[in-house]
Each structure stands twice: as C-alpha cells, then as structure tokens.
C-alpha cells in the first residue's frame, strides 16, 4: 500500500458531488500524489463530450443517451436542482467567488497527470461509446480499478 496513491470512484453525475471528487483529486495530485479516477454508471456522463456525435447506436442506446446529461455543463445538483435553475445559480456564485468551474477542473486534472478511467461494462450497458468521451480518458474494467485500489492508501466512492 502506498500512502501517496489515491483512487476515487465517481458514480454520481451530480454537479456538486463531481466537483468534490475533482477538488479532492486535484488537491492530492498537486501535493504529489498519484491519483486515479474511475468513472462508472452515472459518473460516465461527466466524461461525455457534448460536441461529439457518434454513429451506429441502437435505438435503445440513442434513447438512453438522450435521457442523460451530456457533459459537465448539463449536470444537475444533488439538492436544490429547481428544474435546472440550481446549477445555474451555483455556477453564478462560483464565478462571483472565483471558484474554478468543472471544465477547468477537468483540464487541470489532466495537466496534473490524474488518470481518468471509464468503466467498460457501464459504458456497454449505458450505450456510451469511446468516441463520445473527452480526450485523454482510458477505458478499463473493474479489474483495472481493483488493481489501482489495492495499492492505494485512500479509496473514495463519490
């Protein structure tokens, strides 16, 4: 086990929870720790690139994709979502207080060398293709996560 290694499972696509995951991850990486973020189920929506279009999806995959937020700009809040007004208010307050927005946090995470892994099984179940993910994301299964987690001093589930 290495105290300088951290893993975070990102299961949620709630904006506030995702922000917490990236704040912890970038903070640890800035302190010199090795960080792996494993995105599974709803957390995969964080990695979807709103600008990318993918061909060849089945009808059900298209419907599933249409019902999920595509990218970090569309994420709901876990509390006080208010039909989508909550995230807008949160972003307004963040900007006013000079808090880094999620797209910038993701970019910073990549610059800090944080490994971002998308769960292959969840991608398959939810009809998410590698081509629609942001650049720099690795694909891996539960064995990938467990291999990283078995060496880490801290493992979080968000």
Predicted segments, located by residue:
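Secretory/periplasmic and organellar redox-cofactor proteins
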Residues: 1-6, 45
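Polar low-complexity intrinsically disordered regions
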Residues: 5-7, 64, 152-153
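Histidine-anchored nucleotide/phosphate-binding helix
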Residues: 19-32, 37
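Short internal beta-strands
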Residues: 35-41, 117-120
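N-terminal beta-loop-helix "entrance" segment that forms/cooperates
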Residues: 44-57
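A charged, amphipathic interaction segment
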Residues: 82-140, 144-146
């Amino acid at each position: 086990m290495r105290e300088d290694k951290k893993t975070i499972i990102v299961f949620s696509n709630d904006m506030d929870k995702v922000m917490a995951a990236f704040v912890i991850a970038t903070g640890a990486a800035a302190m010199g720790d090795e960080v792996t973020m494993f995105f599974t189920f709803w957390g995969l929506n964080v990695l979807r690139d709103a600008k990318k279009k993918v061909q060849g999806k089945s009808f059900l995959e298209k419907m599933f994709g249409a019902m999920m937020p595509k990218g970090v700009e569309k994420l709901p809040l876990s509390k006080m979502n208010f039909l989508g007004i909550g995230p807008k208010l949160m972003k307004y307050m963040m900007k006013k207080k000079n808090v880094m927005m999620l797209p910038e946090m993701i970019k910073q995470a990549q610059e800090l060398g944080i490994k971002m892994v998308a769960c292959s099984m969840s991608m398959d179940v939810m009809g998410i293709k590698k081509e629609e993910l942001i650049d720099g994301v690795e694909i891996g299964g539960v064995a990938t996560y467990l291999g990283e987690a078995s060496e880490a001093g801290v493992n979080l589930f968000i």
